[in-house]
């Protein structure tokens, strides 16, 4: 579309000839045949055949395949004639047709047909075909030409090709002239197809920018067909502009000095001549090596274009180049509309005066700083001036125009005094928006994830604090963290948990049954609950209400699991005491009589109330009377109660115990008073009796007693071995020898009530009617009790085994 048939003859072509390959560069190619025979243009006959061999015939090896290429001749008026060549295999000769019509595909096909006829020695048929085509004139620019042997040349409209006539005529071939009103398409247009295949997108954009700047551009390639196709395709990208300077698709060897011309040019040079060209003084020449796909330039022509235009070309060129159709041509047409579409607003129309173009108005437009800078350079370009003159000529002649360029200007809105490229921006946003969002997401996703994790962990910490403070959670046995109570966890197990403080946290207190002792009569065996330890009464958190989760359903206690759990606990604190419920009730058959039901308060019996115990005087005779009645009370009770192992014990403070015992206000309280001094029972073998004195100074007890529940002083009981030959010495001593000795006068101190948990199964059973009477502990008691002999023997067997 870069050339037009201007003022030419009505014939389809001007001259056809066949030239032989010369032996050297200094010789002229001889003409073997020509048509018409009477062609007498001596200038053309001397100059044109040299363009048929635009390579170094002395060094270039013969080509094994047929090659098609084109050269162009420009006269003083700027009119061009194209020479379409077909180089035979082996480069022995070249067929050439000279025409002003840029019908590349049509003439290449015609040359193939004539070449086949000449190869078969059908010279007459070839001349007849050329004669018919030469005498046929074109009726219009959109004509279709049908060539047939025996019936001449038929010309029809561009709607289609008529069917061949019947008779002896043989259809040779049909040629469809290209539509000048349409854009080049892929793959129909050979030149454009060769360009997008051979040259990269970036180099195509660079070549386009160099041509817009009217640089001296030089292309080199080793294949003539590729070289000329790239040259013509690059000119076609300038539509509606037209390259007005020197155009030589293939430069013959005798014209290599043209490369040193100071004016702009677009020249194609065969690779065999490239070395000779580089030896010349080339300055400010843009060189595109098609074979190496490199672009050498000293200018910043791409940066001189508006950024939005460059972005449009780079983003969409590769996509449209891979698809058939007019995509590539229309893409560059849109770029031209964005660059020069504002020329409409610079057209000045005065009544009775011809239409003119105002350069000042064109430059006064404010489409943006980059485009304004480009316009200041564009007004001096020859191609822009020729474009404006062609438009003004049509307007002043009264001819309207509505070509593809004008339609594109209207479509993209590149007029009205500014470059309105909002559609380009929208297209770029759609095309590149996905990559932009992906990059933003890739950068922000790690930060968002870290923020989310930090917020989540902080929220969990706050929730855990709130759960510790307000939640209905319980402390699991042996742990320091709160967790929801399991449905299978019995309230009896929660009653057996030690009242301890873990890491500054507290747990709800266990239910107390002290109210039962204040109200009167006795209750079923094992139903009593030991009182709180002295530490628990003095702790500030002892006033907390009982958690409702402790009063679960009345499930049976898994005694074996409890014993194993107690054995697995590894607390190493010595001399610690804690209240515990006796395991004697676990040996009985009725478990409900040993533990209170969830719905019945522990301080209220089912039928009656226990009588309140009378307060005992604080005097030494009372303690002595309690000791004298120990034998009578022991005959009624079948066994004594000990506490579990020290794995669940809690260390008590002697100072607190002394303070509690010294306070006279405590004795007026009907509730049980705290133990003034902890007591420990030691079991010492006979062969280690010599070490008892050392054990008395540094006690490391493995059995300890704890106060359980108050009882009348008339029924004390002391645990002591009955015979010394059992090799076990039972002693009782305080934890702190330095504690106040007056604490021994406390009549309300009581003996242990529970046996060691892991040895509870060794205790003998007793009758259901037997009562558990508490005993008052004393120091260094060696009384023998007949009822305790079997138990001591069992303990001895356990230790020896």
Curated annotation (Swiss-Prot):
Q: Where is this region: Disordered?
A: 479-540, 604-801
Q: Which residues form the signal peptide?
A: none
Q: Where is the composition biased (Polar residues)?
A: 641-662, 693-703, 773-788
Q: Where is the dDENN domain?
A: 320-398
Low complexity composition bias: residue spans: 619-635, 734-744
Is Cytoplasm there in the keyword field?
yes
User: What name does the UniProt record give this protein?
Assistant: DENN domain-containing protein 1C
């Amino acid at each position: 579309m870069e050339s037009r048939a201007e003022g030419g003859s009505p014939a389809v072509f001007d001259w056809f000839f066949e030239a032989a390959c010369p032996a050297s560069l200094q010789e002229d190619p001889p003409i073997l045949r020509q048509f018409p025979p009477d062609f007498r243009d001596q200038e053309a006959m001397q100059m044109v055949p040299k363009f048929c061999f635009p390579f170094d015939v002395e060094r270039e090896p013969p080509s094994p395949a047929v090659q098609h290429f084109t050269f162009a001749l420009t006269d003083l008026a700027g009119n061009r004639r194209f020479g379409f060549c077909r180089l035979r295999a082996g480069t022995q000769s070249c067929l050439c047709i000279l025409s002003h019509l840029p019908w590349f595909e049509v003439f290449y096909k015609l040359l193939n047909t004539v070449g086949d006829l000449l190869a078969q020695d059908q010279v007459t048929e070839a001349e007849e075909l050329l004669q018919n085509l030469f005498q046929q004139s074109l009726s219009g620019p959109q004509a279709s030409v049908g060539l047939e042997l025996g019936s001449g040349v038929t010309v029809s409209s561009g709607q289609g090709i008529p069917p061949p006539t019947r008779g002896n005529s043989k259809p040779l071939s049909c040629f469809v002239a290209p539509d000048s009103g349409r854009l080049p398409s892929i793959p129909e247009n050979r030149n454009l197809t060769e360009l997008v295949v051979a040259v990269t997108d970036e180099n195509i954009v660079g070549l386009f920018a160099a041509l817009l700047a009217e640089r001296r551009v030089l292309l080199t390639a080793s294949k003539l067909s590729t070289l000329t196709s790239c040259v013509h395709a690059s000119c076609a990208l300038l539509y509606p502009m037209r390259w007005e300077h020197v155009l030589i698709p293939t430069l013959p060897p005798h014209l290599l000095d043209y490369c040193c011309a100071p004016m702009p040019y677009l020249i194609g040079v065969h690779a065999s001549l490239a070395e000779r060209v580089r030896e010349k003084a080339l300055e400010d020449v843009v060189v595109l090596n098609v074979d190496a796909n490199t672009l050498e330039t000293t200018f910043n022509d791409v940066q001189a274009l508006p950024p939005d235009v460059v972005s449009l070309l780079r983003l969409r060129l590769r996509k449209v180049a891979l698809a058939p159709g007019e995509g590539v041509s229309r893409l560059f047409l849109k770029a031209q509309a964005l660059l020069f579409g504002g020329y409409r607003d610079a057209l000045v129309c005065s009544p009775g005066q011809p239409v003119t173009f105002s350069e000042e108005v064109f430059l006064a437009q404010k489409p943006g700083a980059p485009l304004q800078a480009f316009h200041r350079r564009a007004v001096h370009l020859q191609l822009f001036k020729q474009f404006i003159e062609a438009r003004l000529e049509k307007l002043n002649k009264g001819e309207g125009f509505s070509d593809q360029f004008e339609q594109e200007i209207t479509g993209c809105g590149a007029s009205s005094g500014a470059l309105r490229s909002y559609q380009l921006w929208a297209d770029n946003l759609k095309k590149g928006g996905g990559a932009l969002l992906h990059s933003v997401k890739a950068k922000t996703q790690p930060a968002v994830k870290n923020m989310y994790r930090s917020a989540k962990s902080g929220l969990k910490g706050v929730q855990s604090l709130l759960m510790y403070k307000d939640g209905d959670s319980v402390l699991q046995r042996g742990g320091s963290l709160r967790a929801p109570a399991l449905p299978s966890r019995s309230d009896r197990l929660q009653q057996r948990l030690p009242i301890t403080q873990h890491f500054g946290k507290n747990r709800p207190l266990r239910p107390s049954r002290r109210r039962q002792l204040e109200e009167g009569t006795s209750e079923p065996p094992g139903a009593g609950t030991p009182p709180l330890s002295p530490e628990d009464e003095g702790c500030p958190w002892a006033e907390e209400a009982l958690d409702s989760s402790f009063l679960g359903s009345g499930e049976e206690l898994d005694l074996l699991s409890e014993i194993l759990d107690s054995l697995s606990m590894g607390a190493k604190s010595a001399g610690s005491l804690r209240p515990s419920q006796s395991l004697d009730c676990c040996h009985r058959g009725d478990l409900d009589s040993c533990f209170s039901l969830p719905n019945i308060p522990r301080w209220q019996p089912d039928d009656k109330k226990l009588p309140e115990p009378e307060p005992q005087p604080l005097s030494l005779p009372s303690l002595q009377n309690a000791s004298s009645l120990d034998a009578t009370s022991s005959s009624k009770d079948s066994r004594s109660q000990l506490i579990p192992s020290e794995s669940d014990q809690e260390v008590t403070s002697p100072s607190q115990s002394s303070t509690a015992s010294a306070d006279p206000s405590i004795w007026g309280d009907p509730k049980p008073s705290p133990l003034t001094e902890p007591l420990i029972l030691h079991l010492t073998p006979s062969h280690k009796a010599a070490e008892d004195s050392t054990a008395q100074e540094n006690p490391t007890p493995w059995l300890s007693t704890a106060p359980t529940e108050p009882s009348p002083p008339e029924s004390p009981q002391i645990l002591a071995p009955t015979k010394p030959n059992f090799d076990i010495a039972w002693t009782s001593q305080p934890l702190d020898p330095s504690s106040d000795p007056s604490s021994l006068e406390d009549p309300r101190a009581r003996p242990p009530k529970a046996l060691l948990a892991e040895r509870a199964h060794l205790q003998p059973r007793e009758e259901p009617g037997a009562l558990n009477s508490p005993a008052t502990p004393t120091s260094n008691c060696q009384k023998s009790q007949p009822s305790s002999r079997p138990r001591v023997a069992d303990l001895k067997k356990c230790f020896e085994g």
